[in-house]
Amino acid sequence: MIGIDLVDLNVAAVESNPFRKGYLDKVFSAEEQTLITNASKPHTMVWLLWSMKEAVYKIFSNEMNIRVFAPIDIQCSITDLSTESVKGNVCAYNEYYCTQTTISSSYMYSLAAKEKTELQYIKVKLYPYPSTFDYHATAPQSISHHGDYLALAY
């Protein structure tokens, strides 16, 4: 099973203020907040960690049939960081997952899987959103949309 989460960075910059009082404490662990504080682009780091958590949640919620999203209970760590790609590990309720995030100037998307080797086989297709075709007919394993983008993972 795989998960994907996409963030339209332009929309996120306009519609959300993750630095408002109390938000970081509700969503991110102390270690994650340190990553945010020390990042050269704190806003991007917030959405990176959020995207990792969401991608894993999509797997976890389907595997465990649990529909409660408590992002503070999903812990992220980064194992490899560059300007365009990030690899990480995520622990959700004592279940471990691997993530890989692709970052562009206008969006980012995170892929999640139980095994690191699974990530290399995931195919991602990006489309404008809202989409004019029936993407459900293509049978994606995971779907994410935000702002101007739709991401399908196969």
Regions found by a protein language model. Give the residues of each.
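Core catalytic alpha/beta fold that binds nucleotide/phospho-ligands
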Residues: 1-154
